Each structure stands twice: as C-alpha cells, then as structure tokens.
Amino acid sequence: MAQAPAHRAIVDASPWAGIFGTRIESARHYGRHWHATHGIGLVERGGHRSASGRGQVDAMAGDTIATNPGEVHDGRPLDATSRRWRMLYFEPGVLARWAGLQGVLELTRPAARDPVLARHLLRLFSRLDVWQASRTDLARLACDE
C-alpha cells in the first residue's frame, strides 16, 4: 500500500478580530475547493501550482499568494517534494474596512513576486508567532473548541 503524501497543517487563532492564520507543509494534491475568506500568504519553500478563477497559477518560494472569498481553486506541488506556505485569512469586509473602501474588495493577483508585500507578511507572521507563544495552554484549547 502506498504511503500517504507528507502533510502538516496548523491553524492559528490571532489577536486580530476576523483574522486567523495557517501554516502548511504538504506534498498533497488538493482537489477543487474554496474559502469563505480572503487569503493572503507567502510560499516559504518549494513550488505550488493551482488552477484558480484566473487560470493556472505557479508560485515559488518567496512569492505571495492570494484568494478571494468563494474563488474555486486547487493545489499541488510543482515537483515530487513538499511545499511550505503560510496564510492569513480575513473574514469578508475586514480588508475593505482597513482600506477605507465601501463594498466588495477583490484581490486581482493570485501569485506575485512582491518583496515589499512579502516583507510585510513576514512581519505579521512574526507578530502572530510571538502572540501564539505567549498564550497559555488553556487559551489555546479555548480557541480550538
């Protein structure tokens, strides 16, 4: 029997209302699915290929990645190795409010080589890691419930 592809996913609560994070390292192929949130993230290692509402998207380590609420997409590694990425998911309306916009906000680049955005994401992930490390075991369990 074939061994299942390597996979590890962690969902992190956040101190920010309407936002949560994920850390994923996986060699799995994901079937078509969607999220009810905006997602903005960073590929940390390997490469990722997906079909999205904007066509085929390839993202390599250092690239930013994004999805819109309801956008159907899939995902798989670009080669036989796993890839690692982190995401921040924003409940609908959070990004628009931050940007001072009325109505719906759409992210138009599913993958990009954007060093400035990558640097800001790394800072946010770092702050989230510090916050996670400061939480008690009881607080972590309360979030998981």
Task: Give the label of every model feature segment.
Residues 8-106:
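N-terminal regulatory/effector-sensing and dimerization cores
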